[in-house]
């Protein structure tokens, strides 16, 4: 399933940021629903619309206070946060890319990029409330609510922004816009989204002009990345035929296949990451896999796990890597 056709018309970067802001956040300008006569209602609607446009513009310029609505609920930031704790590697990369790095006081143990990120032993998978609050944060950014962290921090009046894994590239831009508003770096975020979008579009042109059957293996139990998730959406943008799509009946983006199903689907490209603990040679030596085209044509490749799984400033590198691998599998030069 192709989520975004390669040659679809795309919005300008600034227009996309505006759309992303609309999708990602609810600002204080949102008006309440109400009754009234037709004429009174129309007048009120016009007045509310004018107020909303004015306040949205102020928020887009980085003015505070702003009210953010995320998966953690709604909260208001009276001023730009100065002590951010990030428990999401993707959010960490984005925060530094949009100029909010100096506001970050601690990041989780998996946030290994960029080098200047203040890495700690904080866990994003099993967060400890006491450990997090020890950094006296005025904003905590997470990708999912592990250990009911949101409720625990909310009780302590610490705002939590849940910046979840996007379903595709476009919603990844929305997540970036959300962080830009929350930190007061809207202009920098617009510039970063523009850069990423431009480089992604250039990388997409490196891909083959014909479909390639792709299998992205998460681990040796045959979990894979379908087109319903962020990783798979990159292959979809490149026009791939993702062999995991049929198995993703619940739309999670990460279905589990059977070994027999993989062999029968005969992928032309198999992608594993450098964190799975085995090599392309190990994949090729699996019983029966010598029948798979990707194995026969030596198109089992390893990619950087961080690049493949993190949405943010390094997305163009993953798109370029995927495009090159797909072009090789298609037997045509990249680009």
Per-segment meaning from a language model:
Residues 148, 171, 175-177, 190, ...:
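Structured C-terminal subdomain patch of bacterial secreted/periplasmic proteins
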Residues 83-135, 139-145, 243:
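A short, structured surface patch at a secondary-structure boundary
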Residues 110-112, 228-254:
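Alpha-helical, coiled-coil/dimerization segments enriched in small aliphatic residues
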Residues 2-90, 186-215, 324-335:
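Bacterial Sec-exported substrate-binding components of ABC uptake systems
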Residues 70-72, 120-130, 248-259:
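Short helix-initiation/N-cap motifs at beta->coil->alpha
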Residues 88-89, 144-145, 165, 218-220, ...:
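Short secondary-structure boundary segments
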Residues 128-142, 158, 258-272:
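Proline-aspartate-enriched helix->loop->beta-strand connector
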Residues 148, 163-179, 211-234, 278-279:
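Extracytoplasmic ligand-binding site segments that recognize negatively charged/polar headgroups
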């Amino acid at each position: 399933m192709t989520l975004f056709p390669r040659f679809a018309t795309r919005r300008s970067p600034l227009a996309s940021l505006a759309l992303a802001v609309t999708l990602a956040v609810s600002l204080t300008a949102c008006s309440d629903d109400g009754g009234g006569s037709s004429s009174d209602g129309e007048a009120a609607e016009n007045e509310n619309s004018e107020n909303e446009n004015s306040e949205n513009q102020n928020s887009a310029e980085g003015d505070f206070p702003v009210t953010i609505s995320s998966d953690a609920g709604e909260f208001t930031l009276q001023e730009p946060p100065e002590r951010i704790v990030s428990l999401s590697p993707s959010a960490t990369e984005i925060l530094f890319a949009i100029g909010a790095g100096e506001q970050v006081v601690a990041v989780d143990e998996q946030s290994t990029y960029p080098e200047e990120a203040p890495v700690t032993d904080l866990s994003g998978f099993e967060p400890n409330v006491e450990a997090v609050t020890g950094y006296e944060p005025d904003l905590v950014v997470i990708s999912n609510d592990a250990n009911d962290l949101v409720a625990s921090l909310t009780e302590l009046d610490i705002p939590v922004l849940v910046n979840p894994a996007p379903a595709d590239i476009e919603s990844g831009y929305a997540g970036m816009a959300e962080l830009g508003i929350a930190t007061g770096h809207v202009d920098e975020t617009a510039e970063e989204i523009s850069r990423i979008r431009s480089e992604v579009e250039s990388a997409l042109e490196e891909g083959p002009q014909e479909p390639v059957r792709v299998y992205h293996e998460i681990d040796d139990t045959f979990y894979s990345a379908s087109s319903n998730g962020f990783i798979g959406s990159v292959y979809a943008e490149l026009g791939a035929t993702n062999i995991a799509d049929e198995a993703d009946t619940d739309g999670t983006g990460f279905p589990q296949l059977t070994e027999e199903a993989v062999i029968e689907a005969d992928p032309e490209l198999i992608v594993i990451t450098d964190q799975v603990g085995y090599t392309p040679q190990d994949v090729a030596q699996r019983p029966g896999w010598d029948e798979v085209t990707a194995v026969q044509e030596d198109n089992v490749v390893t990619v950087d796990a961080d690049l493949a799984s993190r949405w943010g400033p390094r997305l163009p590198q993953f798109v370029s890597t995927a495009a090159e691998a797909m072009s090789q599998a298609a037997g045509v030069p990249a680009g």
